[in-house]
């Protein structure tokens, strides 16, 4: 047996080294959602995000902002892009973004899943863009990807 045959997915497939906002075609979205790994730390971030997001759905809040910070290469953009798919209720090949989390057991906490499903089922306009490409400020000063979500 060869080592490459021990993996669930082909190891010689195209794997994006850097997640970019502009890669929104169905093939890329499907790969990102199916291969996204939710670590214990990310489980906490998903729980916090969707618990707070639910506050705006079921009630009123003036706390609307979210700050995502971390070192270069730590997965901020990837996390944000996955959040955008969930909030947009993105569908690829008949499968909703939330389904990747449920079926693949990426999130197992039923309360977090309930909050995620509520968010996915609540209509929202999600606009995801890289501020570098929309700004006249030199690239060295801008390293933000901003989603705009309107309920």
Residue ranges and their predicted role:
Residues 68:
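Hydrophobic anchor at the beta1->P-loop junction of P-loop NTPases
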Residues 76:
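Conserved lysine of the Walker
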Residues 84-124:
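Flexible phosphate/Mg2+-sensing switch loops adjacent to catalytic phosphate-binding sites
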Residues 79:
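Hydrophobic positions on the alpha1 helix immediately C-terminal to the Walker A/P-loop
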């Amino acid at each position: 047996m060869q080592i490459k045959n021990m993996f669930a997915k082909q190891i010689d497939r195209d794997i994006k080294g850097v997640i970019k906002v502009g890669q929104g075609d169905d093939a890329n979205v499907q790969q990102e959602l199916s291969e996204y790994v939710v670590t214990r730390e990310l489980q906490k971030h998903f729980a916090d995000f969707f618990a707070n997001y639910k506050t705006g759905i079921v009630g009123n809040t003036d706390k609307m902002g979210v700050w995502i910070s971390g070192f270069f290469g730590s997965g901020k953009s990837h996390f944000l892009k996955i959040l955008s798919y969930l909030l947009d209720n993105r569908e690829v090949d008949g499968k909703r973004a939330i389904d990747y989390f449920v079926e693949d057991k990426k999130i197992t906490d039923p309360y977090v899943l309930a909050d995620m499903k509520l968010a996915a089922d609540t209509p929202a306009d999600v606009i995801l863009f890289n501020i570098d490409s929309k700004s006249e400020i030199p690239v060295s000063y801008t390293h933000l990807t901003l989603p705009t979500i309107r309920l």
